[in-house]
From Swiss-Prot:
Glycans are attached at N10, N70, N74. Present with 2120 molecules/cell in log phase SD medium. It comes from Saccharomyces cerevisiae (strain ATCC 204508 / S288c) (Baker's yeast). The keyword Lipid biosynthesis does not apply. This is Uncharacterized protein YDR476C. Keywords: Endoplasmic reticulum, Glycoprotein. GO terms for cellular component: endoplasmic reticulum.
Length: 224
């Protein structure tokens, strides 16, 4: 009776099913838990069955999970009512695991004017350190007493090295505080993490902002 709904949920809500297995099925989600899928919906007992492969034992395991209390009046005799209950369970399970309902499986590179200006600003100290005429060329465009004083102060290997180190440490701290938690929250696959971290070291907060923007474009991922 629910075959088409089961197929739809398995196709589009793998993360939600995994969350339900962890939160409502009380199964720890480790690397050994693979291929979580919905196999049955039983409205008579108000349960659904999840099946998954446990690679350490090599066994396919079934877990029967009760639907949460239907306190919103959803009719479990209809596909619409079942979808609404699943949506609620997906949201609750994701919140309990402190994860997003959606997954970001791409790398968003800097493309806005602000992003590009930040990259230019990051590149200037190393450029001036390696090629000192670049420093003088920059301040040639600002011929005033303040510019001359600042140029004289920056015209030092020690000062430029300190700026480069401070820049790196600041961005590393921003990456640790803002980017890393979002990579976990948005379930970014491991193969994309190194690029996101590298962008964090280059830009600081920028990648965190792009992760949030990408998440907003993906929406919540309800059962349709």
């Amino acid at each position: 009776m629910w075959d088409s709904l089961i197929v739809s949920i398995n196709d589009t809500h793998k993360l939600g099913l995994e969350d339900c297995l962890a939160v409502f099925g009380h199964v720890p989600i480790t690397k050994a838990v693979k291929h979580v899928r919905l196999t049955e919906i039983d409205t008579q007992t108000s349960t659904f069955t999840l099946k998954f492969l446990h690679t350490e034992t090599g066994q396919n395991i079934e877990k029967i999970i009760y639907f949460i209390d239907n306190d919103t009046g959803n009719d479990t005799r209809t596909a619409t009512g079942i979808k609404q209950i699943f949506n609620k369970m997906f949201r609750i399970a994701a919140e309990k695991r402190k994860l997003s309902l959606i997954q970001i499986d791409t790398v968003e590179y800097p493309c806005t004017l602000v992003d590009l200006l930040i990259l230019v600003g990051v590149a200037l100290p190393p450029l001036c350190y390696l090629y000192r005429p670049a420093l003088h060329a920059i301040f040639f465009l600002v011929p005033n007493p303040v510019g001359s004083t600042l140029e004289a102060w920056l015209d030092s290997d020690l000062v430029l090295r300190l700026i480069i180190v401070a820049e790196f440490l600041t961005h590393a701290l921003e990456t640790l505080i803002f980017v890393v938690p979002r990579l976990k929250y948005y379930r970014v696959p491991g193969e994309f993490v190194p690029e996101w971290l590298l962008l964090g070291l280059l830009e600081g907060y920028g990648p965190a902002r792009r992760l949030d923007t990408k998440a907003r474009t993906l929406g919540e991922g309800s059962v349709n």
